């Protein structure tokens, strides 16, 4: 377990007023999230919410034939399990750990109690949910209308925004599953980005070496998602900006 770990590494928790944060912190449980761990399956009853700190979780829509595609990615900016406070209790998506790390887990009844009690938490989580819905909608548009190259750029940028690093540990096969495309398409797209000097890929490890260049190659979808997130959650975006400066 990491020696210097704080629930405030999750930007949603860090954006809570001190009073609300202190009411929650003793009930937050630090848990490891191994790569590939399934936090919940489609249609399952949600018992906990998760606030990632150093992990990334993919929300996948699973078809009847078993095929799946990512509809959103959640990291240290967000929360896994929005259905709990939205009143649905279950969700049609599957939550799978995309990048191993840690998260803080909170029992569902405690989250709902605080959501009902605290107007500040209501506003924060509802604004986050709207930003998450924007990401889902834009991902659907991107998957339908943009090339695999552009989708990969968007995916890499959104993932890096949720990590305190410029490096991802990720196989091309896993990326292909997330994007819902053939592995060969990801191999070709990653090769183009590497030849352009934007990324370095080796043995399941992707390092972004030219982020401005990667953003220039991405379609509009990344900027749409980020702009809406920053508009709805300026307090959370502030914590992200500080983390990005520390990373440089």
What residues fall within each predicted segment?
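Polybasic "coupling" helices that flank or enter modular domains
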Residues: 98-100, 114-182
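Cyclic nucleotide-binding regulatory module and flanking cytosolic helices
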Residues: 1-34, 79, 84-85
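Residues that scaffold the ATP/ADP-binding catalytic core of kinase and kinase-like folds
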Residues: 24, 60, 82-83, 114, ...
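A generic structural signal for short hydrophobic patches within well-formed alpha-helices
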Residues: 21, 79, 111-112, 214
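Phosphate-/nucleic-acid-contacting segments
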Residues: 158-248
